[in-house]
Every structure is written in C-alpha cells, then in structure tokens.
A protein has these predicted regions:
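RNase H-like two-metal-ion nuclease catalytic core shared by retroviral integrases
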Residues: 70, 118-119, 146-168, 180
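Short Lys/Arg-enriched helix C-cap and helix-to-coil transition segments
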Residues: 1-13
Length: 240
C-alpha cells in the first residue's frame, strides 16, 4: 500500500510533471532515465559454506561477520531497457557527481537527459559544481532536465522498481563481504539485463492519477493560489 501524506498543489504539480515525462514517446535524443540509490549491508561468512552435493543441499552457517555498509546507485531507461548500477563506498555529493558524469557519458549524442529523481539534498547542481568546479559541473548539469518527485512520492520513480529488481535478483539472500564483490556482482547483473533488454511497462499516467486521487487538474494552479477540494491524504490500495 502506498500512502500520500498530503495531496497539495506542490505534490500534484510535481506528480503531473513526472507522469507527463513518462508519457512522452520514446526519443533517443531525449532519453528518460530514472535514478535512485540504496544502502547495502556487507556481511562475510565466518565459516566457509558447504556446496551442494548429490543428495545434499547447500549449507551455510547462520553466523556472519558485519562488514559495514556500502551504497548502490541504480539508474534505468525504462523505454529502452538500459540498466546502470554503480556501487559506491557511501552516498555523498561527490559520489553523486561522479555517477552523473558517468551517466552523461553513456548518452553523448543526447540533446538532454530527462532525469527523474527524488529530493535528496545531494541531488542538485551544487554537488556537481563543488566536485567538478563551476564550469565543469555546470556543463554536466546542463546536460540534464531534472524532474523531481514530490515529498513522499518516491513511488513515482521507476528507479524504485529497478532497486527492487537489483535487491531480489542480484543480492538475494547472499552475503556480500565487500565493495569489490558488490561491484563485480552488479556488473554481471547489469550485463544480463541489458542483453535481454528488460523494459519497465509503466501504466500509471496522469488520467489514472486524476481518477485515483479525485482531483481536477484545472483547480491546481499555484500562481493563482486556488485550493482544491481534493482529500488531504490518500492510500493506493493497489498500484498501479
């Protein structure tokens, strides 16, 4: 169940912007890319696991050693089936700047990258200018057209689906002991998905949002200060 804390003008404005971006026909010159990140706990086995043998299941000890945490940036171009995974030591402004630089390198011919992301404080131009300088960071940022999801609206970011796939298909219940292993496994998972060209079939658009939340788009114009009679909060019992 997805819950919206407050359905106000700002929330609807940003939601409509993101959904409008998803509704655009596929255009390789303006790819729509969704980006998000997640922490990953690192665990090492205390005793070597026992592999499967004829008539015996694989076994591993319940005891493990904590090795701290890492971070994974996940990006996906849903319409093209392109997947990107960048494990990093942490989630910092410098790491974000490096990831954005690498992302833009994958689209050298794009007029702009329509980038969907949340409102995390490092998801901004300043992260790039602090790391790359005003000129270099500004140049990279200008390759993007950012679309921010509203607060408590992370469900609008298709990168959340990508993270879920990564967690289930790549990480699973395995123990990842270090960043090197995480990067190796992430690259292998990326290659499999990109070879298969796995796309995301997103079906929740602006018409569905207006029907689900019961608002009229014409009542939400921030410049006019109009207030809608739409409910202040709503839960999506089934999504999409």
């Amino acid at each position: 169940m997805w819950c919206v804390a407050e359905l106000d003008e700002e929330y609807i404005e940003k939601m409509e912007d993101v959904l409008k971006t998803y509704e655009k026909p596929y255009n390789p010159g303006e790819p729509v890319v969704c980006l998000d990140e997640k922490p990953v706990s690192l665990h090492a086995a205390v005793r070597p696991p026992q592999p499967a043998a004829p008539g015996k299941l694989a076994r591993r000890d319940n005891e493990y050693e904590r090795r701290g945490t890492a971070n994974v940036f996940c990006a996906v171009e849903p319409q093209a089936g392109k997947h990107f995974t960048w494990p990093t030591p942490d989630r910092s402004a410098a790491e974000f700047a490096q990831i954005i630089g690498e992302l833009t390198n994958h689209y050298p011919s794009a007029k702009t990258i329509q980038l969907v992301l949340d409102n995390l404080n490092i998801h901004c131009r300043k992260s790039l200018t602090d790391y790359c300088g005003d000129r270099g960071g500004g140049f990279i940022w200008n390759c993007l057209t950012p679309h921010y999801t509203p607060k408590h609206g992370s469900w609008l970011n298709q990168a959340e689906i990508e993270i879920s796939l990564f967690s289930r298909q790549c990480l699973g219940k395995r123990r990842i002991p270090d960043l090197k292993t995480l990067r190796r496994e992430g690259r292998a998972w990326n290659r499999r998905l990109n070879r298969a060209c796995v796309k995301i079939n997103w079906k929740f658009g602006r018409p569905e949002a207006r029907k689900k939340f019961g608002y009229d788009k014409h009542l939400f114009k921030r410049s006019m200060g109009l207030v809608s009679s739409a409910p202040s909060s709503k839960c999506l019992s089934s999504f999409p």
